[in-house]
Amino acid sequence: MERLTEFPFVEDTGASRLRMMFCFHHAGGSAAVFRPWTKYQERLMVVPVELPGKATRISEKPATDGEQLVSSLAGAMAEMINDQEYCVYGHSMGAMLGFKTAALLESEYGMVPRLMVVAGRHEPLRSPVSHFHSSQGEEALVTELVRLGGTPAELLADRELLDWLLPQIIADYRIDETLVHRGEILSCPIHAHVGCEDTETPVELVVGWQAMTSAQFELRSFEGDHFFPHQPGTAYYRELEEEMCANPRTSARQRHRQSNHPGDVEEKDER
């Protein structure tokens, strides 16, 4: 399997025969936040997604247009998926980016994900709830990072490192600000995950995700704040793994054919 720049941690191993789980990170993160999950590929092939200008793609110009980014990522994912099964996971900004990309894969490539899991993200029809806008500049962003938590204090105290990171994070916010819902609805189930102590994304801002699918919707709560997916240990990943592997195996294109036949709709509710 050829390694694409968008998927830096994919190895040509037996995992390539498993159901793929494409993982989209939060604003300010990178594909590396999901690298710990790649150690546990007994049932899933974990595919962290790297954006332009990030970590392993640092030599590239950061993306700032969400719609263009969705188109680019969908093309790369389609090449990798081919006719295999896949599912999508997105945290915070990554939930909306992953949703839009999955919707384009379904509508333009005929590739329907097995499941979409969105974590720590308000539903698409609501305006962003962030206290920060990319036009406010770097100092305002530092204030927002302190308010949010999740950023190590030693990083916030390192001015040289901040000067390198802040433009990347602002680019992420610009991506998020340009990701607009344009009527997309997935034909696969959507599961929404929330942290019990997440004041940024309370349950009432999440339930609207049920309107983004013509299939089943499920809402689950987990211990932790906005960054609950990245708490130490494997408990959350194992729960996620169970969800992603719960449905019967069919290829992405086969599910697209099934979704166009009303008599086959019941398969979407088999859990």
Where do the language-model regions lie?
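Domain-scale detector for complete catalytic domains at protein termini or as standalone homologs
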Residues: M1-Y89, M96-R271
